[in-house]
Design a protein with these regions (language model features):
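Generic enzyme active-site microenvironment
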Residues: 271, 305, 331
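Short, Asp-centered acidic motifs that coordinate Mg2+ and/or phosphate
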Residues: 269, 301, 329
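A glycine-rich (often HGG/GG-containing) alpha/beta subdomain
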Residues: 1-145, 149, 153, 329
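Inter-motif core of Ras-like GTPase G domains
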Residues: 285-309
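Switch I (G2) and immediately adjacent beta-strands of P-loop GTPase domains
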Residues: 52-63, 68-72, 252-280, 298
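C-terminal-of-GTPase-core extension/linker across diverse P-loop GTPases
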Residues: 2-12, 141-263, 280, 311-454
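Short glycine-/small-residue-rich Rossmann-like dinucleotide-binding loops
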Residues: 240, 275-276, 300, 307, ...
Length: 454
């Protein structure tokens, strides 16, 4: 019998309520040892999906009011008996409730152990389990919606669609090879190729959406660059909504890289405000300039900032050169001041140019549109199932490669046995993706990344 586990399921700190979750064969028994229902009823007598108001106690001493929620196996999150004790939020009370249930016989839950048990009891596959962590950590609406699509089985259904095609092709060829004396209709190579192409198209679609999905869910490594005093730090502060970077009229104020994460439209940008690009004799500032140039080369997205109220300088011209071949948006700042004749030259160097005023807080919406367009995610659909991480991508890529090998073998006139080797390998990769054939080491590695209590 698996041990009954318990953990705090809500964030640590002061809040309206705090929840201690128990799961396992003894969950109700252990919760009953610390919970006193106000109506005198016993948790062990309650059916699933039942709540009782009462108090929690250590020994004979009650220390808080509480609500107990009882879920019976298999109709619970984990597939086991589950009890959730909701007490008033606060470090002391919630921790005391956890200590009481541990003293009554529960074992501390490990990271992700509740969701791991849900997976092991068939309540969800690995793609759905991984989406739980993605939903919790989502930093934007698109990321949350995408995670919910996976949690609702969207990705699993896509994978199962490809698997069904592969299994049907494999079964047909295996029957033809294994039972040559039976009256099995002769297989048509063109029909087999069409089926394999359908599976290949499904996998290719998932792989094609991976990079954009990562941009929407994991965020975009973004650097703000420009010569001194064009308003880089002011732009950073305007986007973050707080004085993250120091803004002064003194050139060289920003000397190191300042980093923050912000929402821009549906995207999450991991912003880095850098030192102004210029020649300087100041050793410390020069280090900052070199770091800015390095970040520009590494970043997925460049926000190149120019002062729209002054003529272009050699430093501006150099920035235009540095941005060639990069995914970049030109931000012409200080739109609140009389404009200088710089727009035409900037537009010749950049596909996307946004007029901005960090002082008056205008241009943010236009910047969001330009950034989404530059990254190719302007038509991102969170309802379209996505591969959520590198593990899933590798499994899908392996399956796609094996299907391609099967197609080549079939077109090359190889035996059905030989073709089936590649098809079976593709199926194994997809079954590993969903967890049906994942190794214990892979499963453990996935769930150890979860927070305790989930």
């Amino acid at each position: 019998m698996a041990k009954t586990i318990a953990a705090i399921a809500t964030p640590h700190g002061v809040g309206g309520i705090g929840v201690v979750r128990l799961s396992g064969d003894r969950a109700v028994e252990i919760a009953q040892a610390v919970f006193r229902a106000a109506d005198g009823s016993r948790l062990s007598d309650l059916p699933g999906y039942t709540a009782r108001f009462g108090s929690v106690a250590q020994g004979d001493k009650a220390f808080d009011q509480a609500v107990a929620l009882v879920f019976r196996a298999p109709r619970s999150y984990t597939g086991e008996d589950v009890v959730e004790l909701s007490v008033h939020g606060g470090l002391v009370t919630v921790e005391r409730t956890l200590q009481a249930v541990l003293a009554a016989g529960a074992a501390p839950a490990g990271p992700g152990e509740f969701t791991k048990r849900a997976f092991l009891h068939g309540k969800m596959d690995l793609t759905e389990a991984e989406s739980v962590a993605d939903l919790i950590s989502a930093s934007g609406q698109a990321a949350a919606d995408s995670a919910y699509t996976a949690l609702s089985g969207g990705l699993r259904q896509k994978i199962e669609g490809a698997l069904d095609i592969l299994m049907e092709v494999s079964a047909g060829m295996a029957a033809w090879v294994d039972y040559p004396d039976e009256e099995i209709p002769e297989l048509d190579s063109n029909t087999l190729l069409e089926s394999l192409q359908q599976a290949q198209d499904l996998l290719s679609h998932l792989l094609a959406g991976y990079d954009n999905g990562q941009l929407m869910t994991a965020g975009v490594d973004t650097v703000i660059v420009g010569r001194p005093n064009v308003g880089k730090s002011a732009l950073m502060n305007d986007l973050t909504g707080q004085e993250t970077s120091i803004v002064t009229a003194v050139q060289g104020t920003t000397r190191d890289v300042v980093e923050r994460t912000v929402r821009l439209g549906d995207l999450t940008l991991r912003l880095a405000d850098t030192a102004g690009l210029r020649q300087t004799d100041d050793v410390v500032e020069q280090i900052g300039v070199e770091r800015a140039q390095a970040r520009l080369q590494q970043a997925r997205l460049v926000l190149a900032v120019f002062d729209g109220s002054t003529p272009l300088t050699p430093a501006d011209e150099e920035l235009m050169t540095l941005c060639k071949g990069k995914t970049a948006v030109a931000v012409v700042n200080k739109n609140d001041l009389p404009p200088a004749a710089v727009q035409e030259k900037i537009r010749a160097a950049f596909d996307r140019v946004v007029a901005y005023s960090a002082k008056n807080h205008t241009g943010r919406d236009d910047l969001a549109v330009a950034v989404a367009d530059a990254l190719g995610v302007q038509n991102f659909d969170a309802a379209d199932p996505l591969l959520a991480n590198e593990r899933q991508r590798q499994c899908c890529q392996t399956a796609a490669d094996c299907v391609a090998e099967a197609v080549a073998a079939l077109e090359g006139g190889m035996t059905y046995d030989a073709v089936n080797v590649s098809i079976d390998a593709a199926a194994d990769a997809l079954l590993s993706l969903t967890g049906a054939r994942a190794t214990q080491a892979v499963v453990d590695r996935i769930f150890e990344k979860f927070c305790v209590g989930k």
